[in-house]
């Protein structure tokens, strides 16, 4: 069965402001993880003006310019063409960074064992990843149009930091996923979205990230 598979059972919950800030999905995640194991808060955007409302993960970001798919016409063409189903894309200035930290708002949020960061780096870039404010490593990223993933694992992932050291031009930040073996629930809420925004996302970006994560169930709430 899926629960015995060597990877998490992954659920994507796509909705509007009804689930914004992890409302409803926080309770669903807690119940499923308590019943079937798993941990972590799932997907969290690289940067968003709404992060302060979400209590299941603490996000601190600086140096990013973030665009929402509902206001996609305000985004530069390069970003406008590369939206993911999360509805957010972030463009960094040199030295832009984000730090995510687990909370105790719900059970098992601190049982995260793997974290993954997703981004686009069409040009050569250099990024820094810091695990639990202690283990730091720099990565040289060769320019390519494919979605990139950096994954880290530990007995307990309490925090993760990501920084763009160089190559910020055309770089696109999507966010990070925090998970543990068992059930993962990713909240993809977009305010004022009636479902039509999915047609404004990039099918290739969606397919590439799905190939890396592998969703078993997609819930649509509009």
Across the structure, where does each feature detected by a protein language model lie?
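A short acidic-Thr-Gly-centered motif at the start of a beta-strand
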Residues: 2-7
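Conserved SGNH/GDSL esterase-like catalytic core that processes O-acyl groups on lipids
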Residues: 20-222
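Short hydrophobic beta-strand that contains or immediately precedes a catalytic carboxylate
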Residues: 11-15
């Amino acid at each position: 069965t899926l629960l015995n598979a060597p990877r998490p059972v992954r659920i994507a919950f796509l909705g509007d402001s009804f689930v914004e800030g992890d409302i409803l999905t926080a309770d669903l995640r807690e119940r499923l993880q308590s019943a079937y194991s798993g941990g972590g808060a799932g997907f969290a955007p690289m940067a968003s003006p709404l992060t302060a409302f979400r209590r299941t993960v603490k996000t601190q970001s600086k140096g990013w310019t973030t665009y929402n798919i509902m206001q996609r016409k305000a985004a530069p063409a390069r970003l406008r063409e590369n939206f993911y189903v999360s509805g957010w894309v972030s463009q960094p200035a040199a030295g832009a960074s984000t730090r995510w930290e687990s909370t105790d708002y719900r059970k098992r949020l601190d049982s995260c064992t793997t974290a993954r960061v997703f981004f686009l780096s069409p040009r050569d870039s250099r990024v820094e990843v810091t695990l639990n404010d202690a283990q730091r490593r720099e990565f040289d990223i060769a320019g390519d149009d494919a979605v990139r993933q950096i994954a880290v694992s530990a007995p307990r992932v309490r925090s993760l930091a990501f920084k763009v050291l160089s190559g910020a031009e055309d770089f696109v930040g999507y966010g990070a996923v925090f998970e543990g073996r068992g059930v993962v629930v990713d909240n993809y809420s977009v305010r004022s979205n009636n479902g039509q925004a999915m047609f404004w996302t990039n099918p290739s970006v969606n397919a590439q990230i799905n190939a890396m994560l592998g969703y078993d169930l997609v819930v649509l709430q509009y």
